[in-house]
Amino acid sequence: LSKNYGYNPGRYQGYSLDTPSYKFLARIDWNINENNKLNIRFSKSHDKDSSNPSSSTTPFKDSVIYPGGEDATGGKSQSGRTANAGLYFESARYYQEKNFTSFAAEWNSKWGGISNVLRATYSYQDEPRTYVGGMFPTVDILKNGSYYMGFGPDPFTEGNLRQVKTFVATDEATWSMGIQNFTAGLQFETNKATNGFGAASAGYYVFESM
């Protein structure tokens, strides 16, 4: 693979499943004067989970891709990509990332007998799938009709993404007249969602034997 196609499938054993994770939070409280206070918050987090390659063969049935009733050792068990007797390289695993960023600002002010709260928030949620190595077709090699070994990315990972952006702005004013309190306000909210999915978008090949 490395010599003929310039593709490194990764290791077949001995690789670590440890994944990075971090969280960051920052906050500023500013008392501008007696009638004005400003609060700003920022947070960011990142998680990354390592997963086995998907066992799905959508839109085909398992029996179409893996017709064998026995696994590679001759025993009765799973015959698909996650069969116990099968061997897949490091590149066949995928990582489910979870990235979240948020920003919020709040301004509290007083104007005579009126109290006002102006608030704005923005959040960005990004959950792509990533994998080891570059783009390459998914390749399954069978033995006796069951999964024997494979390399290349998980077939449902390339192009798989989910992104959500949300912005909210709110303005609320409160004033008093005697024993009565009155509140009026406005709110604006916008959301933008992006979802991507492409089964076997990099190609998927199944060989009956080595």
Language-model features, listed with the residues they occupy:
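Ligand-site clamp/hinge motif
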Residues: 7-25
